[in-house]
Amino acid sequence: MLYNLLLPYIHNSHIANLFHYITFRSGLAVLVTLSLSFLIGPRLIKFLQTLQKYGQPIRLDGPESHQAKAGTPTMGGIMIILSSCFSTLLLADLTNKYIWITLFGFVSFSIIGFLDDYAKVTKNNHYGVKGKSKLLLQGIISLIVCILLEYTIDSPSHMLNVPFFKSLSMDLGYLYIFFAIFVIVGASNAVNLTDGLDGLATVPIALTAGSFALISYLVGNLIYSNYLQLTYLPNTGELTIFCASIVGSCLGFLWFNAQPAEVFMGDTGSLSLGGVLGIISVITKHEIVLGIVGGLFVIETISVIMQVYYFKATKGKRIFKMAPLHHHFEKSGWTESKVVIRFWIISLIFVLIGLSSLKLR
């Protein structure tokens, strides 16, 4: 909004001219979301405590240390969503179609998460909305996003680029839409599965969003994209501001979510954040890179899939003491803080590997 309001004065005012730069607006987005999180966080937590009689339901079969978390409110993802959306609307170019499509997906996935959290806190169990119903809703929203990208964006591409190779890409044709839906829904649920310990998912989400802030900026810049031999995608640079908003809001949320957490992100936050990262990876044509920089989310998801299939195949045996993987290490004697920090380090390693693909070709 500020960009659009100041646009006529960019060439006449040094201050207005600053808003012409995506880098300046992105840095400002981080500061705005951080400030908003600190401002609304305590009030939101108090409101959620009043609203939720029992707080986030705690699994009885989980690590014993988790029983101390009983009564902690959930739906804290509202803080992330409000601050990110406000910052994006304030600082991004509101004539940019990518911004509106991304915001649509972000808010839509947050509504699914909210309904899931609401069902959990009202019924006082951890089941929430049925899995098939949730997947169906996620699939519908992802399909709408793909249709919007297909018919509102100039020259939509169905190419799948393979990282670390200069010219290796595949034209999936209209099958790309199904692949994109898989990426978006998969990312949404992968982040949701990772969000099981205080602060565990928050930092990897921020790192992944930061990675795609850089990717969005590079592919949206003709000079940098040509230099790095990336597919040039005009107008995607504005997504840098949205990604920066997520980074700032996640860091602000971590202030309240660090162990011992005052509030949980809930599905309201995890489903929406994972979904929107999937959407941005599709827009920037870096879907496989999302699987690399978000490698921690992939590992957590694979651990659940392996556990479920092995349990069914062996009629009751388990590969891990508990899935997702972070619970396995808790059951093995690691403290929660050790699991969280070590997983953050692993996430950082994946991010560095993923970003190296931008240059190593």
Swiss-Prot record:
The protein's matches in InterPro entries, at most eight in alphabetical order, are given as:
Glycosyl_transferase_4, PNAcMuramoyl-5peptid_Trfase, PNAcMuramoyl-5peptid_Trfase_CS
Q: Where in the cell is it found?
A: Cell inner membrane
PANTHER family linked: PHOSPHO-N-ACETYLMURAMOYL-PENTAPEPTIDE-TRANSFERASE, PHOSPHO-N-ACETYLMURAMOYL-PENTAPEPTIDE-TRANSFERASE HOMOLOG
What does it do? Catalyzes the initial step of the lipid cycle reactions in the biosynthesis of the cell wall peptidoglycan: transfers peptidoglycan precursor phospho-MurNAc-pentapeptide from UDP-MurNAc-pentapeptide onto the lipid carrier undecaprenyl phosphate, yielding undecaprenyl-pyrophosphoryl-MurNAc-pentapeptide, known as lipid I.
Protein name listed in UniProt: Phospho-N-acetylmuramoyl-pentapeptide-transferase
Q: According to the UniProt entry, what is the EC number of this protein?
A: 2.7.8.13
Q: Name one GO biological process term.
A: regulation of cell shape
| GO MF terms held by the record | metal ion binding; phospho-N-acetylmuramoyl-pentapeptide-transferase activity; UDP-N-acetylmuramoyl-L-alanyl-D-glutamyl-meso-2,6-diaminopimelyl-D-alanyl-D-alanine:undecaprenyl-phosphate transferase activity
Query: Known CDD domains for this protein?
Result: GT_MraY (cd06852)
Q: Which GO terms describe its cellular component?
A: plasma membrane
Cofactor section: Mg(2+)
Alphabetical UniProt keywords: Cell cycle, Cell division, Cell inner membrane, Cell membrane, Cell shape, Cell wall biogenesis/degradation, Magnesium, Membrane, Metal-binding, Peptidoglycan synthesis, Transferase, Transmembrane, Transmembrane helix
For whether the record's keyword set contains Transmembrane helix, the answer is: yes
Instruction: Tell me how this protein sits in the membrane.
Output: Multi-pass membrane protein
What metabolic or biological pathway is this protein involved in? Cell wall biogenesis; peptidoglycan biosynthesis
Q: Which family does it belong to?
A: Belongs to the glycosyltransferase 4 family. MraY subfamily.
Q: Which reaction does it catalyse?
A: UDP-N-acetyl-alpha-D-muramoyl-L-alanyl-gamma-D-glutamyl-meso-2,6-diaminopimeloyl-D-alanyl-D-alanine + di-trans,octa-cis-undecaprenyl phosphate = di-trans,octa-cis-undecaprenyl diphospho-N-acetyl-alpha-D-muramoyl-L-alanyl-D-glutamyl-meso-2,6-diaminopimeloyl-D-alanyl-D-alanine + UMP
Q: Which HAMAP family match?
A: MraY
Q: Where are the transmembrane segments?
A: 28-48, 74-94, 99-119, 135-155, 167-187, 203-223, 236-256, 263-283, 288-308, 338-358
